[in-house]
Amino acid sequence: MSAEEMVQIRLEDRCYPVSKSKLIEQSDYFRALYRSGMREAVRPEVGPEVQQLRGLSAPGLRLVLDFINAGGAREGWGLSEDELAEASVLSEMVEAASFLQVTALLRLLLSHVRLGNCLELYRLAQVYGLPDLQDACLRFMVLRFHQVLCQPQFPLLLSPPQAPGDCSLKQRLREARMRGTPVLVALGDFLGGPLAPHPYQGEPPSMLRYEETTERWFPLANNLPPDLVNVRGYGSAILDNYLFIVGGYRITSQEISAAHSYNPITNEWLQVASMNQKRSNFKLVAVNSKLYAIGGQAVSNVECYNPEQDAWNFVAPLPNPLAEFSACECKGKIYVIGGYTTRDRNMNILQYCPSADLWTLFETCDVHIRKQQMVSVEETIYIVGGCLHELGPNRRSSQSEDMLTVQSYNTVTRQWLYLKENTSKSGLNLTCALHNDGIYIMSRDVTLSTSLEHRVFLKYNIFADSWEAFRRFPAFGHNLLISSLYLPNKAET
């Protein structure tokens, strides 16, 4: 059997031996060179021919030739995961692989995109015109958007859009996280009940998803982290299709400052930076790509979380500590309504401007409300549930505090509308989420006499101003939260 023919690749004053057959097999550059009959090789009187290369780095060329000598196999290549995360190694290797057109190596990189190298690989894919690698990096960065934002290299890629209508990389990633299917997800301490279509085995799940076509709830293939079990009075908000659960208190009455985020695209929980202040019974609001933790039990300060730094910083505090209030974002501002000050009912609507870091008195109300939930659509705030106490001369008599109502407040016209009420459903301790064309509400049926909190599930249609009742929620439970998240389409998982 004849010995394998070798070729020497010369770069400056160094030579690297490589199998000629493997070189032709793996490198489109050399395959074209040999097939065209071109002769750039120097053939000495004794020994293998020598191919001269210029302009490449020695470390990058060595890595590519090692890959070629390994027959294009990852197992025999010898490059570690740590080396694949080093920017200098990647830069020199991709440069050499692109020049020599070693497509198998470039294709291999598609499956080795990691948090430590995704930004550098994305940059290199742009430089060397590698669309498949660029797409692989974009997909990875969409999956782990907030973790990628924290990377120190990320700001270096944020070049301004080249033409009107173009989006920055950050905006493209943010929008791509919303391309799945909007799904209602419920979290809580579920105590039992016949989960459709089959009862669960063992411990009850702590996360459920709602399938609208069948009107059934199914266990989500994940559970709350142990640190979140038995936590009450926490703040929750959706930011960039992450569900944040922040603060609260344990059943031992100890307040906490911990923060966690659930990524529905990867179905993972991550712990993020803790707040500076332990707080419970506060409001967490997402606005302008940041989170604001507002007030709390006997607390007036406000903290802002920036996912790009994974850090909380204090901003302008509330004018006064508030209890049993609610807050939401509307057109880039935060509105706080209802509750109590340390001395009296809070009849003021407070507005916070993030850019000015300033709280102002927006308007004074004739109706006092507490323990309500709030969501917004365009310039309209919807107030769901809570306890109403009308103070004006036209107030209604014999009004039950514990019934489900929906009101709206237009922040432009400053007009209140009393939209709908449901006297058989409780307006207290409910949870709701804006989802598609309505507000989905998990409430309690006040006509049932039971010690268990059996929840009812209904929807207020914003456009039709009507209630729509669904099949009874399939589990008893408490400490429930309902949210609307984008889950990946089945074809993409």
Curated annotation (Swiss-Prot):
Location of this chain's protein in the cell: Cytoplasm; Cytoplasm, Cytoskeleton, Spindle
Kelch repeats: 183-241, 242-289, 291-332, 334-379, 381-436, 438-487
Any Pfam family: Kelch_1
GO biological process: cell division; proteasome-mediated ubiquitin-dependent protein catabolic process; protein polyubiquitination; regulation of microtubule-based process
CDD domains found in the cross-reference section: BACK_KLHL42_KLHDC5, BTB_POZ_KLHL42
One Gene Ontology term, aspect cellular component: cytoplasm
A GO molecular-function annotation: ubiquitin-protein transferase activity
Keywords, ordered alphabetically: Cell cycle, Cell division, Cytoplasm, Cytoskeleton, Kelch repeat, Mitosis, Repeat, Ubl conjugation pathway
Record-linked PROSITE patterns: BTB (PS50097)
Pathway assignment: Protein modification; protein ubiquitination
Residue stretches making up the BTB domain: 5-77
Top-rank taxon, per record: Eukaryota
InterPro entries: BTB/POZ_dom, Kelch-BTB_domain-containing, Kelch-typ_b-propeller, Kelch_1, KLHL42_BACK, SKP1/BTB/POZ_sf
Subunit structure: Component of the BCR(KLHL42) E3 ubiquitin ligase complex, at least composed of CUL3 and KLHL42. Interacts (via the BTB domain) with CUL3. Interacts (via the kelch domains) with KATNA1.
Function: Substrate-specific adapter of a BCR (BTB-CUL3-RBX1) E3 ubiquitin-protein ligase complex required for mitotic progression and cytokinesis. The BCR(KLHL42) E3 ubiquitin ligase complex mediates the ubiquitination and subsequent degradation of KATNA1. Involved in microtubule dynamics throughout mitosis.
Protein name: Kelch-like protein 42
Organism: Mus musculus (Mouse)
Lineage: Eukaryota, Metazoa, Chordata, Craniata, Vertebrata
UniProt gene name: Klhl42
